[in-house]
Amino acid sequence: MHRFTIFAGVVAFAVALVTGVTLAEPPTPNRDGAVPNEWLTPSERSDFQQTPRYDETIAFCCRLAEASPLIRVTSFGISPLGRELPLVIVSKGGATPTEAHQRDRVVLLVQNGIHAGECDGKDGALMLLRDIATGKIEPSLFDSVVLLVIPIFNVDGHERFGPHSRINQNGPQEMGWRTTSRNLNLNRDYIKADAVETRAWLKLWNAWNPDFHVDTHTTDGGDWQYDVMLAWERNANAPAP
């Protein structure tokens, strides 16, 4: 459980960072309150032994959208097997790329499940979105930020569920598969863009032009001594214009 809580905190920190909120003065409303049982995420309800399937994940996001005017659930494409690629938008008056750019919003993209068996990011993101919907995270953080969350990127691979997808990983009991239904690794496809999922993602990226991008992964049982590790680009990915 600790690593999921830390992940949600990392993303909350990223939101605070781009809004200029300092760690010395964190938002406090409702932060110490226990989460009501009806708002526990599917993974929390199982004591993190299970991760929700695609339909359950989308249904939980839609519940959050019904509970909070800040949250909207949409999609940015269709997978080869006909599943929508989900996108959750958290904003105040910047729910489209045009609105976000016109209002000079900072855009933060959090992407989960590019390797669908690596589900910690997805489950942590659902906790984060729940805390936003229930007021545990200060809404004023979104006066100047739009948060985009992709709960599951590799949706078809996610539904190739089984107990042996990542046999060295410490839970959950079952999880999705690394590659897509076309056996493509989306994390190796950004340039060649063979997958329809990648092409949809590139359209999303070009439309929103995020200022900050978080891409979550999970180790396959490696003992790294840390609950969460952060890595960032140190070099440009393309020549300067």
Write out the residue ranges for each language-model feature.
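Structured catalytic-domain cores with a bias toward divalent-metal coordination
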Residues: H2, F7, L23-P241
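Bacterial N-terminal signal peptides
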Residues: A8-G20
